[in-house]
UniProtKB/Swiss-Prot annotation:
This is Keratin, type I cytoskeletal 27. Essential for the proper assembly of type I and type II keratin protein complexes and formation of keratin intermediate filaments in the inner root sheath (irs). Residues 396-459 are annotated as: Tail. PROSITE patterns: IF_ROD_2 (PS51842). Residues 234-256 are annotated as: Linker 12. One of its GO terms (molecular function) is structural molecule activity. Belongs to the intermediate filament family. Gene3D superfamilies: 1.20.5.170, Single helix bin, Vasodilator-stimulated phosphoprotein. Residues 142-233 are annotated as: Coil 1B.
Length: 459
């Protein structure tokens, strides 16, 4: 007898002269065969004794023999009688129940194979990797939309930067206008001050002119009086009246008027020179002050323009850095959200795969327990079959192996057979990656002495 474990074979049962047992990773099956020295008698356990029937039961002779077990057991006056018949019936019933279990396990094995096949088709490496829907056709659209969003964000940042530059330029022009307006108002204030000084000088000149006219009128009036007096004196001197008076000498009016005129002219000239000197002094000091103020204003204006340029450059750099920072923050937020979504999706897939793996392991453990139970049943049945053969040997006296019906007599052969089966069990995730690998070695030794089989299985 040989025991074969295979990770790829999913067949149930095999026939041969020595019998065989084949197990798959998804289920279990059992077949056993043996021969008995009684010609025409054969029995199959998932395989016929010495035949190829996998249906079980009693029937099929060795090498085409025609005697059946049913006929053998049906003969009340045959080799077996009494308790031996009951034993045979009990064995037959137990064998039938065992075959029913084998068929049920075969159906369960096929069902598990279909489930595993469907699971691999659904969650295997070529599938959607555990997703209920295939979104791969949307990936190019998503990438294109991401590129459009990035391009729009960049364009928006450029527009914002240009807007900020235009605003800063407008602020610069506004500051320049305010400075020019302040300078214009200062110059106008200076002009108004000079106009007031000019008005004062004009008033002073007018006053002097009025004084000059008054003095001229007074001089004309004095000249007129002098002429009248001269005429009166000349008329009085034209007669023959001699009047001698002893009086003080008279005042010379001409000399007096000349002296007065000279005094007033000197006073007017002095006033004119004083006014001109004061005006020149005030004008010089004012011109010097205006020149100094203009130089200071020009220097301050140049310094202010330079400071404004520096401020504008720094503000432009600040706005550019702020826009870059905002863009990087948006990119970072978007990247974090994308990776969080992907991480959540991967965690969900891992949870689903772990649950499925746990379910598969549970089912595998159940199948393993069923296989161990069936193996115990097999060993027990082999013992009962051996007892059955001993019973038959007790009735018949010998056991022999016959290659054909009506062949030669009893033959004695000693043969031994050793079968070593290595099974590689690999755990593969849905992506096709090997998680773990185990190697099971099964050694089977079969020895035949006088057509009696002795099987030993070691692993």
């Amino acid at each position: 007898m040989s025991v074969r474990f295979s990770s790829t074979s999913r067949r149930l049962g095999s026939c041969g002269g020595t019998g065989s047992v084949r197990l798959s990773s998804g289920g279990a099956g059992f077949g056993a065969g043996n021969t008995c020295g009684v010609p025409g008698i054969g029995s199959g356990f998932s395989c016929a004794f010495g035949g190829s029937s996998s249906a079980g039961g009693y029937g099929g002779g060795l090498g085409g023999g025609s005697a059946s077990c049913a006929a053998f057991t049906g003969n009340e006056h045959g080799l077996l009688s009494g308790n031996e018949k009951v034993t045979m019936q009990n064995l037959n019933d137990r064998l039938a129940s065992y075959l029913e279990n084998v068929r049920a396990l075969e159906e369960a094995n096929a069902d598990l194979e279909q489930k595993i096949k469907g699971w691999y088709e659904k969650f295997g490496p070529g599938s959607c990797r555990g997703l209920d829907h295939d979104y791969s056709r949307y990936f190019p659209i998503i990438d294109e939309l991401k590129n459009q969003i990035i391009s729009a964000t960049t364009s928006n940042a450029h527009v914002v930067l240009q807007n900020d530059n235009a605003r800063l330029t407008a602020d610069d022009f506004r500051l320049k206008f305010e400075n020019e307006l302040a300078l214009h108002q200062s110059v106008e204030a200076d002009i108004n001050g000079l106009r007031r000084v000019l008005d004062e000088l004009t008033l002073c000149r007018t006053d002097l002119e009025i004084q000059l006219e008054t003095l001229s009128e007074e001089l004309a009036y004095l000249k007129k009086n002098h002429e009248e007096e001269m005429k009166a004196l000349q008329c009085a001197a034209g007669g023959n009246v001699n009047v001698e008076m002893n009086a003080a000498p008279g005042v010379d009016l001409t000399v007096l008027l000349n002296n007065m005129r000279a005094e007033y002219e000197a006073l007017a000239e002095q006033n004119r020179r004083d006014a001109e000197a004061w005006f020149n002094e005030k004008s010089a000091s004012l011109q010097q002050q205006i020149s100094d103020d203009a130089g200071a204003t020009t220097s301050a204006r140049n310094e202010l323009i330079e400071m404004k340029r520096t401020l504008q450059t720094l503000e432009i750099e600040l706005q550019s850095l702020l826009a870059t920072k905002h863009s990087l923050e948006c990119s970072l937020t978007e990247t974090e959200s994308n990776y969080c979504a992907q991480l959540a999706q991967i965690q969900a897939q891992i949870g689903a795969l772990e649950e499925q793996l746990h379910q598969v392991r549970t089912e595998t453990e159940g199948q393993k327990l069923e296989y161990e139970q069936l193996l115990d049943i097999k060993v027990h049945l082999e013992k009962e079959i051996e007892t059955y053969c001993l019973l038959i040997d007790g009735e018949d006296g010998s056991c022999s192996k016959s290659k054909g019906y009506g062949g030669p007599g009893n033959q004695t052969k000693d043969s031994s057979k050793t079968t070593i089966v290595k099974t590689v069990v690999e755990e593969i995730d849905p992506r096709g990656k090997v998680l773990s690998s185990r190697v099971h070695t099964v050694e089977e030794k079969s020895t035949k002495v006088n057509n009696k089989n002795e099987q030993r299985v070691s692993s």
